[in-house]
Each structure stands twice: as structure tokens, then as C-alpha cells.
UniProtKB/Swiss-Prot annotation:
Cross-link 5-imidazolinone (Ala-Gly), sequence positions: A141-G143
Cellular compartment(s): Cytoplasm
Protein's name in the database: Histidine ammonia-lyase
Protein's pathway: Amino-acid degradation; L-histidine degradation into L-glutamate; N-formimidoyl-L-glutamate from L-histidine: step 1/3
GO cellular component assignments: cytoplasm
Family: Belongs to the PAL/histidase family.
InterPro entries named among the record's database cross-references: Aromatic_Lyase, Fumarase/histidase_N, HutH, L-Aspartase-like, Phe/His_NH3-lyase_AS
Enzyme Commission number, as recorded: 4.3.1.3
Modified residues (2,3-didehydroalanine (Ser)): S142
Main location: cytoplasm
Chemical reaction(s) catalysed: L-histidine = trans-urocanate + NH4(+)
GO MF annotations in UniProt: histidine ammonia-lyase activity
Annotated CDD domains: PAL-HAL
Record organism: Bacillus cereus (strain ZK / E33L)
Amino acid sequence: MITLTGHTLTVEEMKRLLLEGEGVTACPNSMQKVAECREVVEKIVEDGKVVYGITTGFGKFSDVLIQKEDVKALQHNLIQSHACGIGDPFPEEVSRGMLILRANTMLKGVSGVRPLVVNMLLEFVNRKIHPVVPQQGSLGASGDLAPLSHLALVLLGEGEVFYKGKRAHAMVALTEEGLEPIELEAKEGLALINGTQAMTAQGVLSYIEAEATAYQAELIASMTIEGLQGIIDAFDENVHKARGYKEQVEVASRIRDILHDSKLTTKQGELRVQDAYSLRCIPQVHGASWQVLNYVKEKLEIEMNAATDNPLIFDGGEKVISGGNFHGQPIAFAMDFLKVGMAELANISERRIERLVNPQLNDLPPFLSPEPGLQSGAMIMQYAAASLVSENKTLAHPASVDSIPSSANQEDHVSMGTIASRHAHQIIQNVRRVLSIEMICAMQAAEYRGIENMSTVTKSFYHQGRQQVPSITNDRIFSTDIENITHWLKTNYSIKERLDVNAAL
């Protein structure tokens, strides 16, 4: 059970919450702050003060005063009218993440909701009732209005949820769990939907997958080094310390550890003086991607614990301030950066695939074919990898450089952060497929070199991979092999836990 405080949530805790189904509870001190802040909102309504989002309309309607008797209707109308999401739903892990992050930001005690609202969000998390939230429709400012409106709907007993492995109407799940839908009061609708929790939840899942995929890329690249009898000197510690990037040093160190007892690596000048960049520069390229990952993790953990709605309430109600913390620009930039960093892992992987299958670049059978000419072997696998990396180049175009004014130009600059976050996740799926192709080719190359000559780590990884796909002895439908390895990497070596090189032993 993980305790939410509004200040201390980490990516590692989110991994347990999203992927292992761990439950959540609220810190009592934080809940006390929620209750105290709520008293301020109720006094504002009672006194008839003009405060944006509490006693006024929204966006361009911020100058329209709302009467006390209409305050509840205002919040309900807000949720229904803003539930304009379209397209396929977010993965269930992402909608679960939205619930968690929304509760966490409310626990900072500056949003003005009742403790009841926070408790309802936590009930949904712990009972695994996850809102069906369409992926498209957010501008990333004022936050993720459309996606979070679909989240808010289910608290009211409206909309759809993922429940016990099926899609169902929210009331079906509420009834079965013995829960009553809530009726929103002043500010609560706005507090639920005005924030960055859709882009951030998707970003967290993307980061978790990206981190594990980056470790996998090192292990698979190590198999390719063996298959091509790569020069191990290029990974010498002195080379990488001379440049000074810690991530580069760490990648080189891990690859040395993976290959320390391999009989397939060579020394400088033994077969050739130096390798092509796609082998020699693995620490430099992969290390740079780790720099991106470290940056992204830092920004995500700030945003996961940020107050991102509007207005915010401070000093016991002395200050009720309209600001712009809902603007998703920090996460938009981070997700665009993640897209580029991960796409590059696929780019260099595809070049290693080419070196494995091109007979002009190695002494292996052409296209790793068991009978070149009659059988094409891995020829079209390289085509598939090339297609995926080219698709990634399109997806890697920054979403954050775009902005379209909305709400009659009141909201005249937006982040498009949710688009960036969604595209980052798509890129990661493509990267995993490219790495799967590299692994299939590297395993085949290892067989020509002699499995007994592989390192202890890569040999273990090879045998586990061969449990997923057989050796290429004849042409067959290779798309099945690619998807099998891709699924295996995701479910066994990916987002369940951080990949340690010794995990393959």
C-alpha cells in the first residue's frame, strides 16, 4: 500500500501502482489540509464573492457571475460539456494513473475539493475501476480538459469504465462495489479536469517502458557485437571517462560486464582496426538516450506532485489566485525529448540489423539465410525495421512547437503535451519491434559463430529467446516471430522491473 501525500510520489511507486496493481491510501495530514481548504471554498460561496471557477463561468465565460443556487449545476454542466474526447481509449494503466495523479495533486490541499472527492478517487484505484478515457481531444492547456472530464464522469455514475476485464457503464461497477456516485459541489468539477494528469500518466507509463527498453537495447546490442565479432577495446573505461558523460560510462560498463567472458569479441587489429559506428559508438549513442531518460524522469516526478488546477487557494483563503499551472509545456517538451531519444535507439539498432544481414558487411551467410537464393532469410526483416524507424522519424516531430488558440482566444497558447505523450508511447512500441528484429538476427548469427562461444549472459538470453522463436532453418512467416519476441520483451524483460544484466542469468 502506497501512501499519497501530494509531495512524495515517485516513478518507482507509480510502477508498482500501474503494473502490479498495488493499492493507495491518503496521508491523514494531507487530508486535513484538503478539509481546511474546502472550508474556504464554502465560505466564498456563502459570502457570494466573485472567484473564477467557483462563482463564475469558465474560459471566455469567466466574467459571467453564477448564482449560489446554480453552483452545483455549473460543475455538472462543466463535466458533461467538456467530455468531448474521441478515438480509442488510453491503455487501462494510463486511466488508472490519471486517478492516482489527480488524487495526489488534490492532497496538496490547495484545490478546494471535499475529502469525499479524494476518497472516491482512491476507491476507484483500490477497487480497480478504471475510467474509459478517449485518447484524442486534449490541447494540453487548460490542462487535459477533455480526457479528465471522462474521468470525472465515472465518479458521477456516468460514462464507461474498465471493470473486471470488461468495459461497462460506470453505474454497473459502482452498484456491484456498493459505492454511491457523488454530486459535485462548488469548484470540484474544475478541480477534477483542470490539470495535466492525462499527459503525465501516459508519460509515466511511456517512461517506465522506455527505461526497460533502453536496458534491453544494450543486451541485444551485445549479442550483435558477438555476432559481428566486434572489437571490445572500444568499450574500454578509459575511453568513456575521457569524455565525461556518466551515462556513456555506465553503458560501456554494462556492456563490458555482459561480454566479459565472451569468446566472440575481438581485439583492436585482430580482424580489423576499428568497427563501424553502429557498434563502436553504442555507449555514446545509447548513453545520450539515457541522458534524455534521466531528464524526463526528473520532470515527470515534479509534475506528478504538482498542483495543476486553477484557481489555487493559499494561506487559509487569504489568497485565491488564478494562475496557469495547468499549462502542459514542461511535460510537452519532456515527451518530445523522449520521442527523439527513443527513436535514436531504433535508428542505430536498424543499422546493426543491416550489418548482420548484408553479406558485403560480414562473413555470415547472406541475409542469415540457411540456403541463400532459394530462401530469403532475414532480408525483409530489415525492410520492416527500416519502415518502423522511418515511421518514428515522423512521430518524433515535436508536438510542442504547435499551438492553436481556443475559447475565443482567451486560451491563446496551448502545449499539445498529450499529443507528444501519446506519440512517445507509439515510438516506444516501434523501438521494441525493431529491437526484436535485431535480436532474431543476432541469435541467428550467434548460431553460425557457435553458441558455446557466447558470454554467460548473452548465452542465457539466447536460450530464453529461442523458447519464443525457433532457429531459422527454412523460410516461414517471420511477422509471427517478431511479434512473439516483442511480446516477450514487454511482458518478461520490460515494464515489470528494471532490467539488470544479471537478470538474464
